[in-house]
Amino acid sequence: MITVPHVVNLNLTGQWRENGGQI
């Protein structure tokens, strides 16, 4: 998995994660 902090990303479950997420 690629960890991207401080950025809004779309995770594998299709939910939006703010301020740090794994895609």
Swiss-Prot record:
Q: Which domain of life is it from?
A: Eukaryota
Question: What other note does the entry give for this protein?
Answer: On the 2D-gel the determined pI of this unknown protein is: 6.9, its MW is: 19.8 kDa.
Q: What is this protein called?
A: Unknown protein NF016 from 2D-PAGE
Question: What is the scientific name of the source organism?
Answer: Naegleria fowleri (Brain eating amoeba)
